[in-house]
UniProtKB/Swiss-Prot annotation:
<feature type="disulfide bond" description="Redox-active">
    <location>
        <begin position="234"/>
        <end position="236"/>
    </location>
</feature>
<keyword id="KW-0862">Zinc</keyword>
<feature type="disulfide bond" description="Redox-active">
    <location>
        <begin position="267"/>
        <end position="270"/>
    </location>
</feature>
<dbReference type="GO" id="GO:0051082">
    <property type="term" value="F:unfolded protein binding"/>
</dbReference>
<keyword id="KW-1015">Disulfide bond</keyword>
<keyword id="KW-0143">Chaperone</keyword>
<dbReference type="InterPro" id="IPR000397">
    <property type="entry name" value="Heat_shock_Hsp33"/>
</dbReference>
<dbReference type="Pfam" id="PF01430">
    <property type="entry name" value="HSP33"/>
</dbReference>
<dbReference type="GO" id="GO:0044183">
    <property type="term" value="F:protein folding chaperone"/>
</dbReference>
<keyword id="KW-0963">Cytoplasm</keyword>
<dbReference type="GO" id="GO:0005737">
    <property type="term" value="C:cytoplasm"/>
</dbReference>
<dbReference type="GO" id="GO:0042026">
    <property type="term" value="P:protein refolding"/>
</dbReference>
<protein>
    <recommendedName>
        <fullName>33 kDa chaperonin</fullName>
    </recommendedName>
</protein>
<dbReference type="InterPro" id="IPR016153">
    <property type="entry name" value="Heat_shock_Hsp33_N"/>
</dbReference>
<dbReference type="InterPro" id="IPR023212">
    <property type="entry name" value="Hsp33_helix_hairpin_bin_dom_sf"/>
</dbReference>
<comment type="similarity">
    <text>Belongs to the HSP33 family.</text>
</comment>
<dbReference type="InterPro" id="IPR016154">
    <property type="entry name" value="Heat_shock_Hsp33_C"/>
</dbReference>
Length: 302
């Protein structure tokens, strides 16, 4: 269901250095982030990792060349099963996590410990027009930021530095990157990336772009572009759930309705509930699939 939460503090800000081929993005999400964390009772360690991934998704979506959706996922076999964040070219976001809710999770646990062995990072591009693209790589690095830096260096072969942070109040991120096909003095890049490394998690989550960029680069100030506002919006719908049920097939869906009386599907992102009873399911498939599951003769329904 299309739910929206808007705040002018939920912005992404682009910047570029005129005297060196380096670009950057800053993001700070406040109301959007608070809206997301209210959907579930996230353990602190998972909440922090999800906020960092959300900020990372908004940063990376700044480089989308076509209209569409960028999806970043972290998947594992441990107590944390999945983190996922989506950011669109329309500047909407959503995010959620799945984990073993019976397991004990300490506030300071690392992402690697939560994911266990065999963790992977998945980046998916879903253009509005054209075929989707997906990249899957093993997790490399301690934390979301280092994992993304390693991924981008491997895939784009561009020097990149990323800082991410998430508190109860806000999620934030900073990305600085060499411009492609441009020559940059190693000392100049080291200077910029070293300054970026001095940014603390508290500053990133608590300060807006103007204060962050001044704090880091006041001696060589970048050119800053107009901020872009983001909002929470969930794209779930009854129609999409119907399509999913059709893919499962009438035999399986009819059997579930016989056993449970109806099918209820909850959206992981916004907690909207979609209920399909016997009448709904039969109308969806155009035949009495529930009756067939009960052993009755097959017949169509109008």
């Amino acid at each position: 269901m299309n739910q929206t939460a808007i705040n002018r503090a939920d912005v992404r800000t682009r910047f570029i250095f005129d005297d060196m081929p380096v670009r950057g993005l800053h993001v700070r999400l406040e109301n959007v982030w608070q809206h997301i964390v209210k959907q579930k009772n996230y353990p602190a360690a998972i909440r922090r990792a999800l906020g960092e991934l959300l900020a990372a998704g908004v940063l990376l979506s700044g480089n989308l060349k076509n209209e569409g959706t960028l999806i970043v996922q972290v998947q594992g076999q441990g107590r944390l099963k999945m983190l996922v964040a989506e950011a669109t070219s329309d500047r909407t976001v959503r995010a959620t996590a799945r984990w073993d809710e019976t397991a004990e999770i300490a506030d300071d646990e690392s992402l690697g410990d939560l994911l266990g062995e065999g963790g992977v990072f998945v980046l998916t591009l879903q253009p509005k027009d054209g075929e989707p693209w997906q990249g899957v790589v093993p997790l490399e690095g301690d934390g979301i930021a280092q994992m993304l830096v390693n991924y981008m260096k491997r895939s784009e072969q561009l020097d990149t530095h990323i800082v991410l942070s998430a508190s109860d109040e806000a999620a934030g991120g900073l990305l600085v990157q060499r411009l492609p096909e441009e020559v940059l003095d190693e000392e100049a890049w080291e200077h910029v990336s070293t300054l970026a490394r001095t940014l603390t998690a508290e500053e990133l989550a608590g300060l807006d772009a103007q204060h962050v960029l001044y704090r880091l680069f006041h001696e060589t100030p970048p050119r800053v572009f107009e901020p872009e506002t983001f909002e929470f919006s969930c794209t779930c719908s009854r129609g999409k759930v119907s399509d999913m049920l059709l893919m499962l097939g009438g035999e399986e869906v009819g059997g579930v309705v016989v056993e449970q009386g109806s099918i209820e599907v909850d959206c992981d992102f916004c907690h909207s509930k979609y209920v399909f009873d016997e009448t709904d399911v039969n109308a969806l498939f155009g035949e009495d699939v529930v009756g067939v599951a009960k052993g009755l003769p097959r017949h169509t329904v109008q």
